[in-house]
Design a protein with these regions (language model features):
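A short, Trp-centered hydrophobic/proline-enriched beta-strand micro-motif
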Residues: 103-118, 153-158
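Short, charged N-terminal beta->alpha structural module
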Residues: 1-33
Length: 239
């Protein structure tokens, strides 16, 4: 695991905390307790108190400096640093990773779906089903649709209960939610895959809405992959 050391002045420690949390796999040191031996760290970031605010310097051989103004700019800087400092380790071949993700989804049936708009967020546990390789949810509605209709952006997680680092397993997905027209053939296929006939819908107390989750990024965390020589964290981006 690549660990990044962050050395910070006391006056700008919140900036260091933001960087450390967003980048991940970081160890933070006040400047007066900075280690003398850097051999155990893959990267180093310094956060100094400048006249106009924090000065963030990232890198050892090649250095890049940021002067973030406020939390939003600090988070943006952290994202850029994370992309440079945290490339995927021991990645799986794409086809093997796709198969692993498919198997994980097939072995589960419930996800936590996060939607949001502005400062409003919602996370809902939902049963999912897969039809012709696509991921769907069926629901009677609710506040999750506030975010779906507002911007369509979703994040979803499927995971096992924690029982030790070696058996740790979870899948985080990012993408868009697409509402399926109840009069479409796609809606019919999803309903029938769920074991419901269209005529039965008329007898239900409330309408069932179908939503397709078009996933653009999968992040799989699977401790068992280490035994195959791969990193536990694998990323599959489809865009």
């Amino acid at each position: 695991m690549n660990i990044t050391a962050i050395i910070y002045d006391a006056a700008v420690r919140k900036t260091a905390y933001i960087l450390g949390t967003v980048i991940g796999n970081c160890k933070l040191f006040p400047a007066e307790r900075a280690p003398r031996d850097w051999s155990g760290y893959a990267n180093v970031i310094t956060v100094a108190a400048g006249e106009g605010g924090p000065v963030v310097t990232a890198g050892v051989q090649k250095r890049v400096t940021f002067r973030p103004k406020g939390e939003d700019e600090t988070v943006a800087a952290a994202e850029l640093i994370a992309k440079a400092f945290c490339p995927p380790e021991a990645p799986m071949p794409t086809d093997a990773l796709k198969a692993r993700i498919d198997d994980f989804l097939a072995a589960h049936n419930t996800l936590a779906l996060a939607t949001g708009c502005g400062n409003w967020v919602r996370c809902t546990p939902l049963e999912y089903l897969r039809v012709n390789g696509a991921l769907y949810i069926l629901t009677e509605g609710g506040l999750k649709f506030k975010g779906i209709w507002w911007n369509g952006a979703i994040s979803a997680a499927v995971y096992d209960s924690y029982d030790g680092i070696d058996s740790l397993a979870g899948l985080q997905m990012t993408g868009k939610a697409v509402y399926i027209d109840p009069l479409s053939d796609e809606y019919r296929s999803v309903i029938e895959a769920r074991g419901v006939q269209l005529q039965q819908l008329q007898q239900m107390p409330a309408m069932l809405h179908a939503v397709r989750l078009d996933i653009t990024r999968y992040e799989l965390l699977d401790g068992a992959l280490r035994s195959d020589g791969y990193a536990a964290r694998q990323v599959l981006s489809l865009v």
